[in-house]
Amino acid sequence: MDADDGREDRFAVRVAAGAGTSDAVVVLALRGELDHDTVGPLGGALDDHPRARRVVVDCSGLTFCDSTGLNELLRARLRLRETGGRLDLAGLRPPVERMFEITGAVRVFRVYGDLTEALADEAGPRDGEEVHG
C-alpha cells in the first residue's frame, strides 16, 4: 500500500468558482480531515496564490482539523499580513470550531458564519475584532 493511498479521499482543497479573476480574493473550499498526513494540498493551494490580497477559507466541509492544519493556516495568515493581505475563515463546523476556541485561534482569525457572509464583508473589521455569524 502506497503512503498516499486514501489521502485524497480524506481531504480535498478546491479553489471555489466565482472567487474572482484578479486573484485579489481567493476562496479555498476545504473538505474532509485536515491533519499531518493531508496538509500538503492546503499548503500547495495557499502557495499557488501569492498575489492574493485576501484568502477566504471555506471550512463548511471540514470535519476535522489538528494542530498541523491549524499551524498551516496560522503561517499563511502571517505571510499574507506581511504583504498587506489577510486570511479569513468561514463556516466552521462545531468540532473544528471547538478546537479553534480551545487554542485561542478563533480570536486570531476573522471568522464568518458562512462563505456568503465572508464575501459580503469587503472591508472587514479591524484586526483584533471577532466576527461570528
Predicted regions and their residues:
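STAS-typified acidic loop motif
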Residues: D2-G44
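Intrinsically disordered, low-complexity regulatory regions of eukaryotic regulatory proteins
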Residues: D2-R7, V56, F64, D127
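Short, charged, intrinsically disordered terminal tails
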Residues: R7-R10, G113-G133
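Residues that form or immediately flank small-molecule/cofactor binding pockets and catalytic motifs
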Residues: G18, P94, T116
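Alpha-helix termini
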Residues: T21, L80, P125-E129
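Amphipathic alpha-helical interaction surfaces in cytosolic regulatory modules
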Residues: H36-F109
